[in-house]
A protein has these predicted regions:
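Carrier-protein-dependent adenylate-forming modules in NRPS/ANL systems
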Residues: 1-169, 182-183, 208, 212
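Conserved AMP-binding/adenylation subdomain of ANL enzymes
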Residues: 162-189, 199-225
């Protein structure tokens, strides 16, 4: 095991029609996640450089396909909350120096303002493109377990956002240990409360891919006033 995409592909082969990520009124199956992610990966495959691709997208199932699609493209992803104060977003982008920005339609205008010469892609359009399996296979052959998987920005003890880089290997070790301790199996259903750009959401994203279980994105109004 050297890549988190192996989890997705293995679970999809066993549970293709099972809902893996759910919202209040929407759900997406393992097969749908796989197909959408590969389409996104194909669109982003020609992005130049090795810098992460920034993601600005809402708290919804499509955002997770954006993350995985970036992984298929051979890049690390870096989620950014489009509702943060603009000066904090500017600091994150300046620190990250992304190779591209992938944004949903609600955040596309913001992404274009931030781009400053780098390509911007609309998530909804990328999900409708055609998969180039040969191109994705070539990218996968060149990936190794120590490749960066994601960069998540914390608030920072000084108040300045700081990016924390995690590799495929580190994430795989963590998730496997977590699942072992918590005794999670394919019959379980996780509840996601954390924003998808927070480190705490990592379990809710990757445990289902590893074990074939499901994760529900709980509406904020259910647990916040």
């Amino acid at each position: 095991m050297k890549n988190v995409l192996e989890w997705l592909e293995a679970s999809e082969s066993v549970y293709p029609d099972k809902a893996v990520y759910l919202e209040d009124t929407k759900e997406i199956t393992f097969h749908e996640v796989l197909c959408a992610s590969q389409k996104i990966g194909t669109v982003l495959a020609d992005v130049k450089g090795t810098a992460p691709i920034a993601v600005i997208s809402g708290r919804k199932v499509e955002t997770i396909t954006a993350y995985l699609g970036i992984v298929y493209s051979g890049h690390a992803y870096a989620p950014i909350d489009g509702k943060l104060p603009r000066h904090r977003i500017d600091i994150i982008v300046e620190t990250l120096k992304p190779s591209a920005i992938l944004a949903d339609s609600d955040n596309l205008a913001l992404a274009e303002e931030l781009a400053q010469g780098i390509p911007v892609f609309e998530l909804e359009k990328a999900m409708q493109e055609t998969t180039d399996a040969k191109k994705l296979q070539e990218i996968r052959r060149n990936m190794i377990m120590t490749d960066p998987l994601y960069v998540i920005f914390t608030s920072g003890s000084t108040g300045k956002p700081k990016g924390v880089i995690t590799s495929h290997q580190s994430l795989i070790c963590y998730i496997e240990s977590y699942v072992s301790v918590m005794k999670i199996d394919e019959n379980d259903r996780l509840g996601n409360q954390s924003p998808l750009d927070y480190i705490a959401a990592i379990r809710d994203i990757y445990v289902p891919l590893y074990k074939g279980c499901s994760s529900v994105i709980i509406p904020k109004e259910y647990f916040m006033e």
